[in-house]
Curated annotation (Swiss-Prot):
SUPFAM superfamilies named among the record's database cross-references: Adenine nucleotide alpha hydrolases-like
One function term, GO molecular function aspect: oxidoreductase activity
UniProt keyword annotations, A-Z: Oxidoreductase
Source organism, top-level taxon: Archaea
Organism: Methanocaldococcus jannaschii (strain ATCC 43067 / DSM 2661 / JAL-1 / JCM 10045 / NBRC 100440)
Pfam families linked to this entry: PAPS_reduct (PF01507)
The protein's name: Uncharacterized protein MJ0973
Protein family (similarity comment): In the C-terminal section; belongs to the PAPS reductase family.
Length: 411
């Protein structure tokens, strides 16, 4: 799965949860893992210290520490040296040196432990604790992003060289066969990188941005700023009126994204029909999702007959994209610093629910406008806040969540 540097927002979340003061220049790596919503492993210098997730039951951020977290946090509970196997076991109270500390810990809460040359994580169980995991004591040093970049510079340059060769190959072919070539640009980090790489190779590159009418103002402003700074030949296409189609099609969902066809593909198809064949450079990467992991460098569009998409940064991870941006001092959309991973329509059903609730915090007018629509279509507040509206047919994990919430209400 994909990885990335922790954003300013994510570092703020970690600092609040852990009562820490991590600085924004630290190379804290987050790796996506399966879950109901936002769920990522947190790495410091290659060591996983725990899992950061957005809890859809409590609608709040949670941190689940691993044993390695207590390499940077003083363990609260001291256990007497023993030859007993402790991992996965409840600890007899007489082995706990400072058992009085347990009275301030809630049932099932995490607590750090120290036993001899080991530190670890446990959970409170009754009048004692149960050890979840232990790790040998060692120094865990923080790495700064600038140090990470210095160590990985050669690898990033190799990725760039390969991507440029892919673009050159298709550009030469298009010139020889008199085919058109352009690039799609969303205002996000991936298409920023693929666009700038293509701009190094292709003369008078046509850069296509589709304004669906549902983008954040931040994105519209950034697209203009980006095009001006890098002297791009920007073409802005307007999407069809989403609100008109909404009444006929209903709420767009992850399993029925009619909005993508109406607001993006239809106007693009209309614009590209002047070409016999067109190759479009796209910033999609295989690590972004399970649906993209089987992509190859070239794919015929399933919607636009004369379009073929090419993916020059297909093999890049999220940290590679950000590394290239930092190494080349490239400007990026500030929405990434505010807690958004998906740069697109503000109420996109494919976005995380954690992101949708960030819209509530930062852009209440947009949030309330969409909430009013959802209520008009019959969704209640619980379904809205927990993101049930994002599916036409709920997947098993969301059906299970619904049952948990219903049982909580009965109690």
């Amino acid at each position: 799965m994909d990885d990335k540097f922790a954003s300013k927002f994510e570092i703020d979340v970690l600092n609040k949860l852990l009562n820490k003061n991590f600085s924004y220049d630290l190379a804290i790596i987050l790796k996506k893992i399966g879950g109901l919503d936002y769920r990522k492993k947190v790495f410091i210098n290659g060591e996983c210290i725990g899992i950061l997730e957005f809890d859809l039951i409590d609608l709040d951020w949670k941190f689940h520490p691993y044993a390695s977290y207590y390499l940077i946090e003083e363990p609260k509970i001291k256990i007497k040296p023993t030859k007993r196997k402790l991992k996965g076991k409840k600890v007899p109270v007489d082995l706990i040196e400072n058992a009085e500390e347990l009275k301030d810990i809630n049932e099932n809460d995490y607590v750090g432990v120290e036993v001899g040359n080991y530190v670890g994580v446990a959970v409170k169980k009754g009048d004692t604790i149960k050890i979840k995991d232990l790790t040998l004591k060692k120094e865990l040093r923080f790495e700064k992003i600038e140090d990470y970049l210095r160590k990985n510079k050669d690898r990033i340059e190799k990725l760039e060289k390969k991507s440029l060769s892919i673009i050159k190959k298709y550009y030469e072919m298009c010139k020889n066969k008199n085919y058109a070539i352009n690039t799609s640009f969303s205002g996000g980090k991936d298409s920023s990188v693929s666009t700038l790489l293509a701009n190094k190779v292709i003369d008078d590159l046509e850069v296509i941005f589709i304004d669906t009418g549902l983008e954040f103002k931040d994105t519209i402003d950034f697209v203009k700023k980006f095009a001006k700074k890098y002297d791009l030949n920007l073409v802005v296409l307007k999407g069809k009126n989403f609100w008109e189609y909404l009444e006929k099609e209903g709420i767009p969902t992850k399993d029925y994204r009619w909005c993508n066809s109406v607001c993006k593909l239809e106007p693009l198809k209309e614009y590209l029909k002047k070409y016999k064949r067109v190759y479009t450079i796209d910033g999609s990467r295989r690590y972004e999702s399970f649906t993209r992991e089987k992509l190859t460098y070239e794919r015929k569009s399933g919607f636009i007959e004369n379009q073929i998409n090419i993916f020059p940064i297909l093999d890049w991870r999220g940290t590679d994209v950000w590394s290239w941006i930092y190494l080349n001092d490239v400007i990026y959309n500030e929405l990434y610093d505010k807690g958004f991973e998906r740069i697109g329509c503000y109420m996109c059903p494919a976005a995380l629910n954690a992101e949708f609730l960030r819209v509530k915090e930062l852009y209440p007018e947009l949030f309330n406008k969409w909430v009013d629509v959802l209520k008009r279509f019959g969704y209640d507040e619980d379904e809205i806040l927990r993101g049930f509206w994002r599916w036409k047919e709920l997947p098993p994990k969301m059906k299970e969540l619904k049952k948990i919430l219903e049982n909580k209400e009965k109690k």
